[in-house]
Amino acid sequence: MVSHASSGRPSSRDTGMVYLGLGMQDAYSSEVQEVAAFYHVDLDRGLSDRDVQQARIKYGRNQMEAEQSTPLWKLILKQFDDLLVKILLGAAIVDFIIAISEGESIQSGLIEPMVILLILVANATVGVVTERNAEKAIEQLKSYEADDATVLRNGQLQLIPSADIVPGDIVELAVGNKVPADTRVSHIYTTSLKIDQSLLTGESQAVEKHTEVVHNEQAVYQDKLNMLFSGTLVVAGRARGIVVGTGSNTAIGKIRDAMGVEEDVVTPLKAKLDEFGALLSKVIAGICVLVWVVNINRFNDPALGGWFQGAIHYFKIAVALAVAAIPEGLPAVVTTCLALGTRKMARHNAIVRTLPSVETLGCTTVICSDKTGTLTTNQMSVIKVAAVQSSSSQLAEFDVTGTTFSPEGMVLGPGGVVLRQPADTPCLAHAAQCAALCNDSQVFVAQKTGTLQRIGESTEIALRVFAEKIGLPSSIRPDRPISRSQFGTNNFWQEDVERLALLEFSRDRKMMSVLVKGSDRQHNIWSKGAPEFVLRKCSHVLANNGEGAVPLTDNMRQAILSDMQAFGSRQALRCLALAFKSVPTTTTKLDYSDESGLTFIGLLGMHDPPRPECRSALSTCHNAGIKVIMVTGDNKGTAEAVARQVGALSPSTALAGSDDEDNLGISYTGREFEEMGALGQAAATRNLVVLSRVEPMHKLRLVELLKAQGHVVAMTGDGVNDAPALLRADIGIAMGSGTAVAKHAADMVLGDDNFATIVFAVAEGRVIFNNTKQFIRYMISSNIGEVVAIFLAALLGLPEVLTPVQLLWVNLVTDGLPATALGFNRADKDMMARGPRRVDDPIVNGWLFLRYLIIGMYVGIVTVYGFIWWYISFPEGGNMTWSQLTHFQACASQPGGAKDCEVFHSKHPTTISMSVLVVVEMFNALNNLSEDSSLLRIPPWDNKWLVGAIATSMALHFGILYTGASAMFGVTGLSFAEWTMVIKLSAPVILVDEIMKAWSRRRQRHPASSRGGPVSLMEIQVPLTSSSRDEAALKLK
């Protein structure tokens, strides 16, 4: 039957339709003639050239507006918009100016500033590259815009660029065409029109369209069965329609706009580092000012050349303090450790696109997971067959294993017995032949790649896979071997017959039939369709016990329909009935009247199977305190059934609408959720497990609500429809088989589409964060030691103990390698048995900060002590008194004059200080193998990377001492006696930390554990966004 609307030029009466300057917004709820009248278009002739010009002026071109990318110079400047970076920049500039003012050469004065600038440029480069990659998400949407389209203009069909389409155009679409713009269906020229709109709605099945009005003012995309959406694909049928939305005023355009307005989300670690940076900058400023002020009375020291020169001298010390206090290597170490973590995750098919998302995974409290292709395989499979066993109305059920499009699986008979030759069973043999012949899909193995290629609807592909699992009866001896992997059974049946006629699937008949002529010249009709409709056309049933075709009785009919209902209610299976009949050889055409007197073959139960790993993955999430919410475009019953199969819902769980009030609110449709209003929505998320029939905006709203309640939200998805929610979530997770848009909008891509991979990624995220805390603490304590050394030297009036360039070398190179290696500390065994950490958990709490302050003070004191020891106590050193050392500026006026001043130019004391600083920090790195466990329990070789990093750092340190680089850093080689003192001063740091670890273990009567996820909804105020229906703040009591 052809579905159409009456043609002719509509009157230009006032249609009363809604007009928002963007075209007709309610075309789905309007008659075709009303839509045509709105756009003043003749359904038989289309728009005229003049109409097209006017429409283009009014609506613009059918293109998404290009986003203005951020200029490169702005991206570069953005990387320097950080408080610590600004302090370092200021220190570099001031250091250069002072060096030049004191008569140093430009080359000499540039060394320290250039080192600082190179560090900052390296970090900025990484930031710019990362942000440039993020902009690709918007551009990827263009791949879903059709290139060309067939339109009716001036009474003639024309092929034009899709960008030239305007609202009001009549477009013609056929199988394989991509819909160029949002279109109201006006004519369907085939018995059915099916659209694959999974990229927009997430529906796993192609959707059948029609021309009738949809009487539903709140219809979501899935309900608008008379609308074709831009970017979706025609998989069956031919039709015409009126374009009602172009460019950004399409469903996909609105998704793109939602992506475009997303703001950068600060991850928990980034927020903590920002807070730490702000605090550190204040501390640095205070210390620098304090050092400068404390030494004001020394500005007039004659040895410094006057008050102004004295002020400059102590200002240089303040600059050195700033350099010492800032952990310059921290950004690089954090980036390196996260990058190394991503490499490990990539080996397990979790491909991370943005480094901060690694850390965010560790504190995820909610995963909003798409069903199709994420929790399920997105590969329909026949898993049940029901047939009439005998004329006594007894039914026999068969199970079919295998849950993918790969033709591997077994057939189990009643009682679970494996059938070695399934096709020798009459009903299965006929079912396989019907599945192969009454089928328009194609499945084949590509010769070049060896991969399975498929064309057509997933239901029909599942039938081909089913036929392959059944195989051929043993009575048939094919001319050549049948290869299951090459779909040999399907090929045999197709080559054995000639298709003579086809009755396509239609909405009113709900079945499809083909007429074929076999090699034996026998003509047969093979039919498939909805069981209740096929049964009406049947007069006989194929008995499975060898009786052949027996009359279909009322008892048989009732038994078949009862089995169908059981399939649907128990496992939410989609049921399909198969039938056939032989016709005279003179029959060469098919008519609807031929679909009668059929012989019923059997029922097939099929579904989109859950991934086998999902149940255990969801169990792990539960143990780890992570809530999983299924969010899908499929219907409510199917979604709930899958939720039960993967363990998200228990089989006994009562759902919305039941009498059990304690279990209400577990499952909602998108419309039910939307109609609740802000108060109801926020309350519903507490127990929500399944949200079905959703649109993109529902996903966004869900993410907003969860984030407002303090949750750290991960959203998984694979379609264009998921992209805005992926961007809005704290971490977006796309499937590897998903669309390019989803992948570029996501923070992480699952290469194997395996939900279990998410669990591994979450665990790895927790490990990485714990290790990140360890090396951050290590670097903080090291920097505290450097600050203490500079501050103490300034207070005591000592010569320059460490120069800024030496401090930079220690911070970046010798400290950086062990800090990075700490990222490889082993995970705690109960990592996934604890709840997620709270976002506001500090990296360093009060007690830990006190511990590292003590360590830092020890580091600073022994660094200065080594310096003093060389001048006063070392026989081969300065051999001077304390007074001479602290009044080094007056050496020229002392006995010996210039000769005595030469000792203050020796490189040995500063080299000893630098070496003590390096070695003590290597020992301190060992302290950070664990927060509280002793080195006696966790030996250094437990982290071989750390041992290697310490060895490398020491080798680099020896390198600058005993090579030509010593001049650049102002150091020199040390004697055995000097190295002995360095070790004596450095090693006790382990004893100091062991004492504090023991005290820490004593004060913790129970092992430290996570405080779990977010606070209860009953305890918080929930701020609402502008998208909420209620504008007031919400407080649940």
Curated annotation (Swiss-Prot):
Top enzyme class: translocase
PROSITE patterns membership: ATPASE_E1_E2
UniProt KW keywords: ATP-binding, Magnesium, Membrane, Nucleotide-binding, Phosphoprotein, Translocase, Transmembrane, Transmembrane helix
Enzyme nomenclature, EC number: 7.2.2.-
InterPro entries: ATPase_P-typ_cation-transptr_C (IPR006068), ATPase_P-typ_cation-transptr_N (IPR004014), ATPase_P-typ_cyto_dom_N (IPR023299), ATPase_P-typ_P_site (IPR018303), ATPase_P-typ_TM_dom_sf (IPR023298), ATPase_P-typ_transduc_dom_A_sf (IPR008250), HAD-like_sf (IPR036412), HAD_sf (IPR023214)
GO cellular component, one term: membrane
Subcellular location: Membrane
Membrane topology: Multi-pass membrane protein
Molecular functions (GO terms): ATP binding; ATP hydrolysis activity; P-type calcium transporter activity
Active site residues of this protein: D370
Main location class: membrane
Catalytic activities: ATP + H2O = ADP + phosphate + H(+)
Keyword set includes Lyase: no
Membrane-spanning ranges: 83-103, 109-129, 276-296, 317-337, 398-418, 731-751, 790-810, 852-872, 945-965, 971-991
Homology family: Belongs to the cation transport ATPase (P-type) (TC 3.A.3) family. Type IIA subfamily.
Function: Could possibly be a calcium ATPase.
Protein name per Swiss-Prot or TrEMBL: Cation-transporting ATPase CA1
Organism this protein belongs to: Dunaliella bioculata
Lineage: Eukaryota, Viridiplantae, Chlorophyta, core chlorophytes, Chlorophyceae
Gene: CA1
